[in-house]
A protein has these predicted regions:
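Hydrophobic ligand-binding cavity/cleft-lining segments
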Residues: 1-49, 146
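Glycine-rich portal/gate segments that line the openings of hydrophobic small-molecule binding cavities
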Residues: 37-82, 135
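Long amphipathic alpha-helical segments used for membrane anchoring, targeting, substrate engagement
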Residues: 27, 123, 137-139
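Beta-strand/loop substructures that line and gate deep hydrophobic ligand-binding cavities in soluble
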Residues: 75-130
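Intrinsic-disorder/low-complexity, polar/charged segments enriched in Ser/Thr/Lys/Arg/Asp/Glu/Gln
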Residues: 2-6, 43-45, 58-60, 73, ...
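Short, highly charged C-terminal tails/helix-capping segments
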Residues: 138-147
């Protein structure tokens, strides 16, 4: 599944970059995120509960910053496991705009879900994913714009 979008954030680009590269900050905005463990600057682990329709699963997700070009581009790769389900994702975030802001974030994600969770159907998964993505970016935007 492919997801993409653009978010306008009324904040300086370096502050947006710092927030987005801090797993604890981003994790605090992720629906269902229960814990974040920072292993080093490029590796972290999260536990998150995800529900789609009548199925819910608790994922353990390993994430890696695969590429970074501060303060413009970051590519993250993730692999998550839950009993009977798995998810793999690659996400790209590109920041643009004047240094003092506002900042435009273009993002995209390629996500593959397998196992029990995938059995509920792509349409239901996409609807849930779009809702969670929207909640995450609304939270990120609100926190950054609040200062």
């Amino acid at each position: 599944m492919q997801f993409s979008g653009t978010v306008e954030i009324a904040a300086p680009r370096d502050r947006v970059w710092s927030f987005l590269m801090d797993p604890n900050e981003v994790g605090s905005c992720g629906p269902g995120v229960e814990t974040i463990e920072v292993i080093d600057a490029d590796h972290f682990k999260a536990k998150a509960k995800v529900g789609v329709g009548f199925i819910s699963a608790r994922f353990v997700v390993d994430m890696t910053v695969a590429e970074r070009n501060e303060p413009e581009l970051a590519v993250l790769k993730a692999h998550g496991q839950a009993p009977g389900s798995a998810v793999d994702a690659t996400a790209n975030r590109h920041l643009d705009g004047p240094a003092e802001g506002p900042t435009t974030m273009d993002w995209s994600a390629d996500v593959t879900i397998s196992g029990t969770l995938a059995s509920v159907g792509a349409r239901m998964i996409e609807g849930t994913a779009n809702k969670m993505i929207g909640q995450t970016f609304d939270c990120i935007k609100a926190k950054l714009e609040a200062g």
